[in-house]
């Protein structure tokens, strides 16, 4: 369950990211840490996301966040970009990571959890497609629980 401050944080972060040609992928507020950690994952709209993008977003967002006083106590702000071990969700994710090794977790017809690894071939309205040892494997999207990047097969 998302922290109750996340909607206000996203409302503040998205226009700043837009001005920098960036997109906010997600925000997570880890309040079980001392001090709490606010992590924003960003992605460049015009190419690869680099350290410079994270630095620009960090500087701009930190000022706005402090002015808005959404988080009254001390916190740590982390700006990062999606990478390995991240879950693929959007159409852009599936296009960007086509050809990369992934692990697909799905639900079988008898309600078991099944994990398959392969090279991502793509996704359409009905299925996710993997290459497993030279064979194309089709997994119905209705059965897919999660698609994650992995380091290698």
Curated annotation (Swiss-Prot):
GO process terms (BP): ribosomal small subunit assembly; translation
Keywords assigned: Cytoplasm, Ribosome biogenesis
Highest taxon in the source lineage: Bacteria
Protein's job: Required for maturation of 30S ribosomal subunits.
Subcellular localization: Cytoplasm
Coiled-coil segments on the chain, per record: none
SUPFAM superfamilies cross-referenced by the UniProt entry: YhbC-like, C-terminal domain, YhbC-like, N-terminal domain
Lineage: Bacteria, Bacillati, Cyanobacteriota, Cyanophyceae, Synechococcales
Family stated for the protein in its record: Belongs to the RimP family.
Organism: Synechococcus elongatus (strain ATCC 33912 / PCC 7942 / FACHB-805)
GO cellular component, one term: cytosol
Major localization listed first in the record, in broad terms: cytoplasm
Protein name: Ribosome maturation factor RimP
């Amino acid at each position: 369950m998302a922290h109750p401050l996340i909607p206000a944080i996203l409302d503040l972060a998205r226009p700043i990211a837009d001005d920098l040609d960036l997109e906010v992928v997600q925000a997570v507020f880890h309040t079980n840490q001392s001090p709490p950690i606010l992590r924003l994952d960003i992605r460049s709209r015009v190419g690869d996301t680099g350290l410079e993008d994270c630095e620009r977003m960090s500087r701009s967002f930190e000022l706005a966040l402090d002015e808005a006083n959404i988080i009254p106590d001390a916190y740590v702000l982390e700006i990062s970009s999606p990478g390995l071990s991240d879950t693929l969700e959007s159409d852009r994710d599936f296009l960007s990571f086509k050809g990369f090794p992934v692990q697909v977790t799905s639900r079988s017809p008898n309600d078991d959890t099944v994990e398959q690894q392969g090279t991502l071939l793509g996704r359409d309205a009905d299925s996710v497609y993997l290459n497993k040892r030279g064979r194309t494997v089709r997994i119905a999207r209705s059965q897919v629980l999660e698609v994650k990047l992995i380091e290698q097969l």
